């Protein structure tokens, strides 16, 4: 991905007017403004910032859309949070034993935004409610005067002057808001239920992902093959979330936002046991939230006047 990509767009108030998106690598904030119409215009100024951490196995792709509306008495910013969170699923021998193999896997993916700026307030976000569907598609729309609304799907943006959409896949997982107030929002994308060869299993089932090869020396063989694992366990998760904030005009020139991507990891132990007749089998034992908040947090500084984005820190 290109770093520090900057896109500047002026949006007419005409419904769903097409956007021009010139890509300017390493450019500065746009210096000129084009007014369209008779003073009832909305200007959308776009910035994009990419940050990757090999340590945490996370890439953040954050789109910052500044909404400059002459009929709205506040600054507004739409943050679209995309990227990739690796599953970091791992198989290993438990404490060097020969009869216990372990699988560490993501029970939950974490996505969050927070600010401590007293002049900034969270005014909208997507998704809002608990969502169990495999495919998630929603739209945030903006109408002149500071009116933000959400639509249930990508096709529901016909009545907006400007819109921003999210779309992601969460097979066998559910999305829900864990925390939300005027300064922050935190989502959890959590394991739900899984179709297995022995039937439907809860995400809390102690035998979930336990395999059928008790005589193998390879830890991987104690668990089901990749073909039976959903993408969010086998590879990772591609988030697509939106938060909208307002800022008091004439107050601070800059605000800081902390954006967090990460995961909570469960550990499933597959234990080799023997029956009374000497037959071997695998018995599952589960440790829920064995590793919590394995998160990558980046602090971004937003300049409300120049519309520049700076990375101020990361863990």
UniProtKB/Swiss-Prot annotation:
Keywords: Cytolysis, Hemolysis, Signal, Toxin, Virulence. InterPro entries: Bi-component_toxin_staph, Leukocidin/Hemolysin_toxin, Leukocidin/porin_MspA_sf. GO terms for cellular component: extracellular region. GO terms for biological process: cytolysis in another organism. One of its GO terms (molecular function) is toxin activity. Residues 1-29 form the signal peptide. Belongs to the aerolysin family. NCBIfam families: hlyII. Toxicity requires sequential binding and synergistic association of a class S and a class F component which form heterooligomeric complexes. HlgC (class S) associates with HlgB (class F) thus forming an CB toxin. Toxin that seems to act by forming pores in the membrane of the cell. Has a hemolytic and a leucotoxic activity. This is Gamma-hemolysin component C. It comes from Staphylococcus aureus (strain MRSA252). The lineage of its organism: Bacteria, Bacillati, Bacillota, Bacilli, Bacillales. The gene is hlgC.
